[in-house]
């Protein structure tokens, strides 16, 4: 059947113009991206406090070390894309990057945080190893170029409204700044109102552009569906994560919390910290067979 959505060689045209500019494998501290070894990006959605963020970092670090998966810790200093103006956003750039810098120093972990404005990129880059472009902002040229100019690795989350092959343009914006250290994250596609679905074909499509990570927690989000905030279906996190690992992703992105019902952001789609170890053990077993 013909149609603009059909997966054909023509849909990979952006891959042909950008793939030579992207590193298919690169290091982020001790983590090798695109090496064939599955890696993990995990942490709370937002910095709720220094003590809480540090506690989560240390707990996730222990679990990752025990099961044998390389870890990049993540947390946000500002959630600028919340549904409501009344929602908690975080401590802000100055205090948030201070906290993330201390956690990176004390744990030895590489750290990821998201940036929302070009002016934030250089400041955040002084504290963290990976700058993340939020899905809602994945077409913002100035933001992508500014992130690329820092020299830090850049994780671009695919917008809920973007075709996977069109992410080649986002990749090219980062590489135009002379930075080949780019990877992409799938986090679901809008399917009607307040709902997301995951098209696993996108993982194969985007791997022609750059290394690919699957976000198993935001993919089960039901955006803006819970009275001024987002809901979620966390019971499907293991289902989608297993499928993504079997499909050959390079890494996994999981937001975890020790008390999801009381999390200050995205608790409805977070993975309970107690469930992280058994999930990772199962995913690593699948990866060993599938790779």
What is the predicted function of each stretch?
Residues 47-59, 91-98, 231-239:
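Glycine-rich anion/phosphate-binding loops
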Residues 60-62, 88-111, 147-153, 203-212, ...:
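Alpha-helix-loop-beta-strand connector modules within alpha/beta enzyme cores
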Residues 151-256:
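Catalytic alpha/beta core domains of metabolic enzymes, predominantly
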Residues 19-40, 291:
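N-terminal amphipathic alpha-helix/helix-capping segment at the start of soluble metabolic enzymes
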Residues 44-53, 72-93, 256-268:
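Glycine-rich, proline-tolerant flexible connector loops at the mouths of alpha/beta enzymes
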Residues 91-92, 109-120, 129-142, 153-164, ...:
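Catalytic beta/alpha-barrel core
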Residues 37-41, 70-74, 110-112, 129-130, ...:
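Structural preference for beta-strand elements that scaffold enzyme active sites
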């Amino acid at each position: 059947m013909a149609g603009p959505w059909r997966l054909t060689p023509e849909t990979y045209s952006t891959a042909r113009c950008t793939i030579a500019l992207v590193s298919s494998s690169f290091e982020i501290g001790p983590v090798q991206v695109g090496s064939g070894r599955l890696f993990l990006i995990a942490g709370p959605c937002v910095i709720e406090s220094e003590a809480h963020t540090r506690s989560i970092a240390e707990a996730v670090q222990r679990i990752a070390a025990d099961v044998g998966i390389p870890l990049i810790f993540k947390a946000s200093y500002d959630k600028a894309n919340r549904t409501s103006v009344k929602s908690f956003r975080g401590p802000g750039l100055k205090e948030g990057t201070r906290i993330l810098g201390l956690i990176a120093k004390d744990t030895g972990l590489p750290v990821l945080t998201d940036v929302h404005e070009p002016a934030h990129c250089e400041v955040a880059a002084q504290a963290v190893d990976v700058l993340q472009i939020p899905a809602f902002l994945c077409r913002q040229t100035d933001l992508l170029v500014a992130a690329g100019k820092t020299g830090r690795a850049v994780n671009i989350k695919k917008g809920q409204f973007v075709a996977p092959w069109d992410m080649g343009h986002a990749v090219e914006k980062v590489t135009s700044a002379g930075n080949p250290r780019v990877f992409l994250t799938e986090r679901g596609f809008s399917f009607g109102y307040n709902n997301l679905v995951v098209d696993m074909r996108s993982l194969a499509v985007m791997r022609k552009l750059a290394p690919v990570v699957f976000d198993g927690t935001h993919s089960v989000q039901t955006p803006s569906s819970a009275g001024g905030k987002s809901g979620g279906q966390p019971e499907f996190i293991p289902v989608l994560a297993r499928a993504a690992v079997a499909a050959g992703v390079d890494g996994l992105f999981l937001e975890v919390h020790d008390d999801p019902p009381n999390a200050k952001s995205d608790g409805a789609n977070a993975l309970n910290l107690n469930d992280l170890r058994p999930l990772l053990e199962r995913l690593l077993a699948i990866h060993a067979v599938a790779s």
